[in-house]
UniProtKB/Swiss-Prot annotation:
Localisation per UniProt entry: Membrane
Catalytic reactions on record: L-cysteinyl-[protein] + hexadecanoyl-CoA = S-hexadecanoyl-L-cysteinyl-[protein] + CoA
Record-given protein name: Probable palmitoyltransferase AKR2
MF terms in GO: protein-cysteine S-palmitoyltransferase activity
PROSITE patterns associated with the record: ANK_REP_REGION, ANK_REPEAT, DHHC
Lineage: Eukaryota, Fungi, Dikarya, Ascomycota, Saccharomycotina
Length: 730
């Protein structure tokens, strides 16, 4: 057949069912029919596929082109409807094809298509078959880097008596753990280790899992393997141990950091722990800020302010580095792979030391000279301090709303099956860390090691997560601290005005070089210790004030900090791509490594775009780095909040005309009227209780108000509808 006539017939296949039937009735060569059939599968043209199969023009078990049959191509291209149709029409799900003699199940697993894998297994696909390289379904699942598929295979194949070993080897003796470590896929590494994968096994090159992780270059995977007892000194066939390999692969710094985090020196020798008990290490870290406060106070009494500041900063740096080097290695690593001072009681100790020193200065210096003139302010400071202390203790010990984990296998299988049936088996609806269905607005916390309902943020000042059950308590605490700092600053300023009368000085106080305010100048010269505390309190007052504005704005809008971060992220992507942000950006897929594949259908979700910093222009790259720094201290939230409050989101970007006529939050999924949002947050769901009790008491259950309706946040899988709208779900 000529190429021209073939092209004409090919064009005829797109003219509808009638023209296709006419095409099939004509006497065309089998190769062209097969070619048309395969192209229809690749293009997801179910009508053409059905027409070809139902006409009998092709045998679906003998339809190979490029050595792969139609079912294989449907699995490769994630054509769920076509694969389902072909299986129902009798396609052999265990047919091997291609140079490596792989089955359709192997191809579906290789590309991470969870729903196709589930379809094939439920229709008799044999998970124990291997391809020409000795790879089975578990190897291919790991290779896909789709953690959702790995979870599925581990629960429905490996642990379901299907004779697929967690340590199954390919013809190069590589286990799934070796593959995952080599790819730097820490989620898969952690999951395989949880299922009992053996760390000590090596491949034909003599590489163990830690060798592979050093090649992969993911620090969390390296840390997981170190914690699991990987051998640092084992040599591969090239006589390289982990230290040699790390040096050659450029991952030496990562390896040394991982060793340090887990109590080893740079040579891999176990360092002696200063504290044998974890509680002793935490107590030492908590008390260290008290020592710093006392030192700063004493040194300010005997040295000039500039010298006192310099020495204080030096001691702070030495103390922090000493804690990192000697005390942090003594801490038990339970839920986090990398311990930093932020995840220790250091900042809660810093808060308490500041709080204690504030009261000390007030009692020793401020109160004696304000008791008669400002009795009311002193009384308020005392009451607020007591209130703050009680709230602090309650917050440290509070439950943020952690969901209880169920480690048994059966509920996990049931949950996965349920999510697959409703088309929601993905990272947005299933937590791979706790292996349970993820309620809306919940988030996994590394600190708590659990899903936290209506998670807001981790607060180092109270050494706890802030979520459903303690968020209102946290707001009371923050307002109390802010008012206490305001009272202290006010009393300090009044005290500074009297310092030249309080302290007998022969000469008038020295002129200030930088401080032009007479009151502050008196304070810095006559009482440096109180002045230093005043400056420290003032800095915290400004920072906490900004945080309170952001928190109040979020409460006003009915969103949480992670949801605001997601909105900021999507807004930046939209700005870079000249797109409108998603109407539901909270539940977008974060990146390619954690991707989830769902069946192709008309209701498929929008693809999330990703942008690499390396691909940006130098100017934009600098902006990206600054944005990352701002996000660490919450400045990005401040900026977005003020922009939204003032309605100048587009003008601040330099655009005279907005690209889209809605604010960042207008299409937020759970946006309700501001009055509803306020009552949802400040009043618990017990409508039978008095109003004052609903306001001051947080609920100790998982139930709370959302959109004016009581919901169970532990079982929140659908959002209450906004007024005049249908119910939304994730």
């Amino acid at each position: 057949m000529s190429e021209v006539s073939r092209d004409e017939n090919m064009r005829g296949t797109s003219d509808g069912i009638g023209s296709q039937a006419q095409f099939l009735e004509s006497e065309l060569d089998t190769e062209f029919v097969v070619e048309t059939f395969i192209e229809a599968i690749k293009d997801d043209d179910l009508k053409v596929v059905k027409e070809v199969v139902e006409s009998g023009a092709i045998d679906i078990n003998k339809d190979c082109i490029d050595e792969l049959p139609g079912l294989h191509w449907a699995c490769i291209k994630n054509r769920f409807s076509i694969a389902k149709f072909l299986i129902r029409r009798g396609a052999n799900v265990n047919q091997t094809a291609g140079p490596e003699r792989a089955t359709a199940l192997h191809w579906a697993a290789r590309y991470g298509h969870v729903y196709i894998v589930d379809l094939l297994l439920k229709h008799g696909a044999n998970p124990t078959l291997i391809d020409g390289q000795g790879l089975n379904i578990l190897h291919f699942s790991v290779y896909s880097s789709n953690i959702m598929l790995v979870v599925y295979v581990l629960y429905f194949v490996v642990s379901n008596n299907n004779n697929v070993d967690i340590d199954s080897r390919d013809y190069n003796n590589r286990t799934p753990l070796l593959w995952a470590a080599y790819q730097g896929d820490f989620l898969t590494v952690e999951l395989l280790l949880k299922f009992g994968a053996t760390v000590a096994l090596t491949d034909n090159r003599g590489f163990n899992a830690l060798h592979c992780a050093l090649v992969g270059g993911d620090q969390r995977a390296i840390c997981d393997l170190i914690l699991s007892g990987a051998n640092f000194y084992e040599r591969n066939n090239q006589k390289q141990d982990c230290f040699d390999l790390a040096k050659g692969m450029g991952t030496k710094a990562l390896f040394e950091q991982a060793l340090q985090h887990h109590g080893y020196d740079k040579l891999g020798n176990q360092k002696d722990k200063i504290f044998k008990k974890n509680s002793h290490s935490q107590l030492m870290i908590f008390l260290s800020p008290f020592a710093l406060m006392i030192y700063t106070y004493l040194i300010s009494l005997i040295l000039s302010p500039p010298l006192a500041i310099a020495l204080s900063l030096l001691v702070i740096v030495v103390t922090v580095n000493s804690l990192k080097k000697f005390v942090l290695p003594s801490l038990t690593r339970k839920n986090i792979y990398k311990v930093s001072l932020v995840r220790t009681p250091f900042f809660s100790g810093l808060f308490m030391s500041t709080f204690s020193f504030l009261l000390f200065i007030w009692v020793k210096k401020l109160y004696p000279y304000s008791v008669f003139d400002y009795t009311a302010k002193d009384a308020q400071l005392l009451i607020t301090s007591l209130f703050t202390f009680v709230l602090f203790l309650k917050l440290v010990r509070s439950d943020p709303g952690c969901l209880k984990m169920d480690d048994s296998t059966t509920p996990v299988r049931e949950t996965i099956n349920q999510l697959i049936q409703i088309g929601k088996y993905d990272r947005n609806n299933f937590c791979v860390e706790t292996l349970e269905r993820k309620p809306l607005r919940s988030k996994y916390s590394l600190f708590s090691g659990a899903l936290v309902a209506r998670f807001n943020h981790y607060c180092p000042w109270v050494y706890n997560d802030i979520g459903l059950k303690n968020h209102k308590l946290f707001m009371f605490f923050a307002f109390s601290v802010q008012y206490e700092m305001f009272l202290f600053m006010w009393l300090c300023l009044e005290y500074f005005k009297k310092t030249n009368h309080i302290y007998e000085q022969v000469e008038e106080y020295a002129k200030c070089t930088f401080l032009k305010n007479e009151t502050l100048c008196k304070g810095s010269n006559y009482d440096p210790s109180t002045f230093f505390l005043f400056i420290w309190i003032s800095m915290n007052f400004v920072w906490l004030g900004g945080m309170l504005i952001v928190q109040c704005f979020q409460i006003f809008k009915g969103i949480t900090s992670p949801e605001l971060y997601a909105l900021i992220k999507e807004e930046r992507k939209a700005e870079a791509l000249n797109l409108i942000p998603f109407e539901n950006p909270i539940f977008s897929i974060p990146n390619g490594k954690n991707r989830d594949t769902v069946p192709e259908d008309p209701n498929a979700t929008t693809v999330t775009h990703t942008i690499s910093i390396d691909s940006l222009e130098p100017r934009n790259r600098r902006h990206a780095i600054l944005d990352a720094c701002f996000s660490m201290v919450g400045l990005n939230q401040w900026v977005v909040t003020f922009k939204e409050m003032l309605g100048i989101s587009n003008l601040l970007r330099g655009n005279s005309q907005p690209r889209h006529n809605h604010s960042l939050l207008r299409n937020f999924l759970v946006a309700n009227h501001w009055k509803t949002n306020l009552t949802d947050f400040w009043l618990n769901s017990d409508v039978t209780a008095p109003l004052w009790q609903r306001f001051f008491y947080s609920s100790d259950t998982s139930k709370a108000m959302l959109g004016g309706v009581e919901v169970d946040y532990y079982q929140l899988y659908e959002l209450p509808a906004r007024e005049g709208e249908p119910i939304s779900s994730n």
